[in-house]
Amino acid sequence: MAGLETTPEMFDLRMSEEVRPLFDAVKKFITEEVDPHTNEFFRLGEGREERWGYGEGQLELLDSLKAKAKEQGLWNFFLPDAETGEGLKNLDYAYIATELGKNPIASQSLNCSAPDTGNMEVLERVGTPEQKEKWLTPLLNGEIRSAYAMTEPDIPSSDAKNISCRAILDGDEWVINGEKFYISGAGDPRCKIMICMVQTNPDGPPHKRQSQILVPMDNPGVEILGPCHVFGKDDAPHGHMHLRFNDCRVPKDNILLGEGRGFEISQVRLGPGRIHHCMRSIGAAERAIEMMVKRGLTREAFGKPIASLGKNIEVIAKARIEIESMRRMVLTAAKAMDELGNEAARVWVSAVKAMVPIRVCHIIDEAIQIHGAAGVSQWTPLADMYTSQRTLRLADGPDEVHWFVVGRAELRRWEEEGGIKYDPKADYYSEDSKTVLTAGI
């Protein structure tokens, strides 16, 4: 892999004309249907008797939004296969996902929530007809939720070769033992199935030791030890759960794609998933700057609007510039996936995953600052938005892994193209270099 590979076609970042009506319809649906009911959805969940359940009326409200979305054809459009979705290109979906990121329940309302989107794409691409009928169909219908179990408590899971949760074939069943934690969505009572990354061949080549297996949540061998907190919150009823597999038996046919092909599936799932996260993050940044500007223009201190005090106007300007630079990077990464394929575009995917969450964190932090104490209170969504983005710097690979992928690719590009041997003296101490350096001082 040599650097951030480009083609002339990748610089055309326009949305497809045939997708424009869908984009406009999604934007209108979120504004007219989802936004007016968002506060009510969360209000209904306050003071509920069952913490790992939903308040009276919550799911009914969400189901009504889903029904309206289905009626308008705004359903499963994230899938690249036109038989089950709209057949959108990654670039086209990037524009839509940005709108989804502006509202915390928009993705659920249109059946485009993580981790379901990644799991549905895996099942759609590599699932058997039986697996699709049993699990993909209810997911596509929005009838159930799902989880993806990869991270483990006792190993650095950023290197997936370390996966130690074992699955041993016993006759016609896989027997799974081990632990997983921070399994997002596993606390939701609607979560019925998870895709579990396990070690099936410990003596095989490093990238052929793992497999991915479908495990029903109600399997008696699955024990939920409790929620893993994120910034002091358990994120109920969604949750990020700590799971233990105790002689968990599942049918042999529950394996996806075949034994030892877990890494292949991860590339199918995690590449698009990382892009989707970054797309939604741009939407969160847009919401943060909107709140920042409105607060700055409507609040006064020392006889002036807050926006004009100190460096606040510079803060707003930098936020807008950063959003537009991130947007272009994410759109280019999406176009790279369309033009080059997921594997060839993985350096682009790592580039945006390393860049976007940390910059969006910074923008939300500035919005919090302009709001004062209200910025960290229950009266604005900014605190939750910040913790979500800060967590994203760890989810689907920490920043450092993605910086490494990009840096390594850049080094390889120079090695492959020029066989360069770097001599700093040749760069900085030649007569020409001295002239340039002096001119720059």
Q: Which role fits each region the language model picked out?
A:
Residues 1-104, 113, 126-131, 138-143, ...:
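Alpha-helical interface subdomain recognition
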Residues 162, 220-249:
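Flexible, small-/acidic-enriched active-site or ligand-binding loops
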Residues 142-151:
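A short, Trp-centered hydrophobic/proline-enriched beta-strand micro-motif
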Residues 73, 96-102, 197-199, 214-222, ...:
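Short Ser/Thr-interspersed hydrophobic loop/turn segments at strand-loop and sheet-helix junctions
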Residues 110-130, 159:
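N-terminal glycine-rich flavin-associated loop
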Residues 247-264:
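Long, acidic (Asp/Glu-rich), low-complexity accessory segments flanking structured domains
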Residues 88-90, 158-161, 186-191, 205-209, ...:
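Short glycine/proline-enriched turns and hinge-like loops at secondary-structure junctions
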Residues 172-173, 177-225:
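A short core secondary-structure module
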